[in-house]
């Protein structure tokens, strides 16, 4: 049976920024909202692949953050973006979904954590390749990102080459850091997914988030995994979807691992199986 043609919807945030969003209808009361990483868009292949895979388990809403893709405004690198996520979550409620989870990648992970900790209204939260703190420059990739957003030439290149419009104003007030926000998410279930080959944020960021958070929480350190959307193979996407489905069931107080690790695997590590070419960052 052929799926219906997907059409985009324009949602408007409380500060009047138009947000380009799409909805892949599900067959249950569960919706997964995808929050993409910096310089990406719901139309980019890695994001679209994950959206379609999640759609086998749940309804899916994905969108472009401000300053990205077909949305308006300028990117504030995670500060005002919680308003973007808020309008999409509200839209999911309007569509009739009773269980709503947000899955964020990299920058999107920091936004999902801050939204869940400061605003609330989610039934489960997943952070994939997210930072534990701001201003991290400990890797070459993150030093490049800082040059791209802090310098005028960097912002120009980012706009023209990566189709991402970054605000030149910076943060007037430093937003609540991701780890501090993670501490406020309980009793909503939280899953932290991170690769041990992440070239942007090393695993210490995932551990920082996990240590700050309260139960119920889980940490999956994935051997061989790199960074964010491009590093998520089909097996991992399916495992996250199963965790979300179990975590949001009303009769289950504490979610269990969708695929528990074997006896030779540490309790906070989940082995990677059947890696695909998509696993390259």
Predicted regions located by residue number:
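Conserved alpha/beta-hydrolase
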Residues: 51-72
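Catalytic histidine-centered segment of alpha/beta-hydrolase-like enzymes
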Residues: 225-235
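Alpha/beta-hydrolase active-site loop
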Residues: 76-95
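Short beta-strand/loop motif that positions the catalytic acidic residue
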Residues: 185-186, 192-194
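The serine-hydrolase catalytic nucleophile loop
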Residues: 38-51
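Conserved alpha/beta-hydrolase "acid-adjacent" motif
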Residues: 199-205
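Primarily recognizes the serine-hydrolase "nucleophile elbow" in alpha/beta-hydrolase
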Residues: 91-146
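N-terminal cap/lid segment of alpha/beta-hydrolase-fold proteins
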Residues: 1-26
């Amino acid at each position: 049976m052929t799926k219906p043609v997907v059409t985009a919807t324009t949602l408007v945030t409380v500060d009047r920024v138009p947000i380009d969003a799409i909805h892949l209808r599900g067959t249950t009361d569960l919706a997964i909202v995808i929050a993409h990483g910096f310089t990406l868009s719901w139309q980019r292949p890695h994001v679209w692949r994950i959206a379609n895979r999640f759609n086998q388990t749940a309804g899916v809403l994905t969108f472009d953050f401000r300053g990205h893709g077909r949305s308006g405004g300028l990117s504030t690198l995670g500060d005002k973006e919680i308003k973007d996520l808020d309008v999409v979550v509200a839209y999911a409620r309007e569509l009739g979904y009773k269980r709503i989870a947000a899955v964020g990648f990299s920058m999107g992970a920091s936004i999902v954590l801050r939204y869940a900790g400061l605003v609330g209204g989610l039934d489960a939260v997943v952070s994939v390749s997210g930072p534990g703190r701001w201003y991290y420059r400990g890797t070459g990739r993150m030093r490049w990102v800082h040059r791209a957003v802090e310098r005028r030439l960097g912002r120009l290149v980012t706009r023209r080459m990566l189709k991402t419009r970054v605000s030149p104003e910076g943060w007037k007030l430093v937003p609540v850091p991701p780890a501090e926000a993670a501490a406020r998410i309980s009793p909503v279930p939280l899953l932290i997914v991170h690769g041990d080959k992440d070239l942007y944020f090393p695993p210490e960021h995932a551990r920082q988030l996990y240590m700050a958070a309260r139960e119920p929480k889980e940490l999956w350190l994935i051997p061989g995994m790199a960074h964010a959307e491009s590093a998520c193979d089909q097996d991992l996407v399916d495992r996250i979807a199963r965790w979300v489905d179990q975590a949001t069931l009303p009769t289950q107080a504490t979610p269990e691992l969708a695929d528990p690790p074997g006896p030779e695997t540490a309790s906070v590590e989940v082995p990677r199986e059947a890696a695909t070419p998509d696993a390259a960052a």
